[in-house]
């Protein structure tokens, strides 16, 4: 196939009217008459790292997750690039992919995330990425020790996604079913990206409230991180419907709102009940204040 001649074939799957063949660093198609090499420097790096869904073939390379219908592949994982960049080479080469409904799933092992200055932020274990093809949105799961996926059609479920696990005794499990994780409680947590509040990024803003609209949930907690400082909890809890939660300073000072350039919001629920968040909004005032230096 070209590229690294020592790289063995890891992708061998029909899509459309061609046979797609891939090694770690190259792709080719066979159309019953000739072999055409793409020679793009990308390939499929895992024996289980590809899956077909909704007329397309998806596969994982060292640089991300790609989609093709038999032609040139398209990178679709830009929004979760930090997770793939933070995965190890061994984790990517052991990746597994599967599908359930309108979503594809990809396990990538241990992931280390980094701050913009290059310092280590956090390490996530047993990461699985979900991509919803209908709304083109990504969801990140942790703690799923999946080594291979398979979709089965049963008498009551046409989209039962099973996976082989490295848990004790190597059980076969079903993904996204029930209300526990193999008998363990599932904590609910959503973290936003770092949000710049003012159009002029150097200006200071005053944050007042977090507004949470929830379809399910009864004891939802909210944490904020101002200017990349550690998260701290704000007072009150949210429940089903719309809840307005006042943002106070870390020391609980209610006299004046916190000042910041950027903010991250973390929504968490440990009530052992199902939780579903529809929308989150912030209220704040921009100012013309600025400082010589502020993170």
Each language-model region and where it sits:
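Surface-exposed extracellular loop regions of Gram-negative outer-membrane beta-barrel proteins
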Residues: 17-39
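Generic structural signal for coil-to-beta-strand starts
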Residues: 18, 26, 56-57, 64
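Beta-sheet repeat architectures centered on beta-propellers
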Residues: 42-56, 62-295
